[in-house]
Amino acid sequence: MSKLTIEQFIAAIKEMSMLELNDLVKAIETEFGVSAAAPVAVAAAPAAAEAPTEVTIKLVEAGANKVGVIKLIREITGLGLMEAKTAAETAGSVIKEDVKTEEANEIKKKFDELGAKVQLV
């Protein structure tokens, strides 16, 4: 097996879809016993908890209109057909990260209209 150079490795990562990158991170976590979560520094608790300005949209359930959900996922993310289909069939799939709350609520409404269930975290 030939060794990849750093440049080749980075180029291969750039070509991966979001789902493939997610699988890669999980495999690295499992293989090396590490976590991709950023270390948290202990700080003083804020005086008042603010509502998050950016959220992550996760698909809980695609519902009966799976074709419509796949089309909506493609529209939102720009994923290819197979990646969008895989995301629609996988419960807990991250549809989009770091979305402004207003935009996330609009996207959630579109999924609700299709009979799908999404979670904003």
Swiss-Prot record:
One term under GO cellular component: cytosolic large ribosomal subunit
One Pfam family it belongs to: Ribosomal_L12
The protein's name in its UniProt record: Large ribosomal subunit protein bL12
Keywords of this entry: Ribonucleoprotein, Ribosomal protein
Ribosomal protein as UniProt keyword: yes
Family recorded in the similarity comment: Belongs to the bacterial ribosomal protein bL12 family.
Source organism (scientific name): Ureaplasma urealyticum serovar 10 (strain ATCC 33699 / Western)
GO molecular function, one term: structural constituent of ribosome
The keyword Ribosomal protein appears for this protein: yes
Transmembrane domains' residue ranges: none
Protein role: Forms part of the ribosomal stalk which helps the ribosome interact with GTP-bound translation factors. Is thus essential for accurate translation.
PANTHER family linked: 39S RIBOSOMAL PROTEIN L12, LARGE RIBOSOMAL SUBUNIT PROTEIN BL12M
Subunit and partners: Homodimer. Part of the ribosomal stalk of the 50S ribosomal subunit. Forms a multimeric L10(L12)X complex, where L10 forms an elongated spine to which 2 to 4 L12 dimers bind in a sequential fashion. Binds GTP-bound translation factors.
Alphabetical GO biological process terms: translation
